[in-house]
Amino acid sequence: MREEIFGPVVTVYVYEDASFDETLELIDESTEYALTGSIFARDRKALIHATDRLRNAAGNVYYNEKCTGAVVGQQPFGGARASGTNDKAGSVSIFWRFVSARSIKENFVGLEDFSYPSNLV
């Protein structure tokens, strides 16, 4: 697929076992879009290998689940690459997109000990 299409589209690619890594490379490099993806496999090692190899290939990845399987309000959701900024709507991490955090610490007791490390009591 070369375009991002929002609609009921499914792509099924059947590959030979010997072509697994080549297929993962095709998935990872064939499009600039990366909203969601699903991996169906009975072999847990294959799932882990695919996840490691496709780390940046989709904002959300589903194992043995349809790629529209996000649980709204319970599972962070957001696309990567040209499909978004990979901010996860529904997660506290989306908050950091709109703020610049600054930490402030104030001592109300008075500073008497200047030794280091200062975190020891």
State where each predicted segment sits.
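Conserved C-terminal structural/oligomerization subdomain of aldehyde/semialdehyde dehydrogenase
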Residues: M1-V121
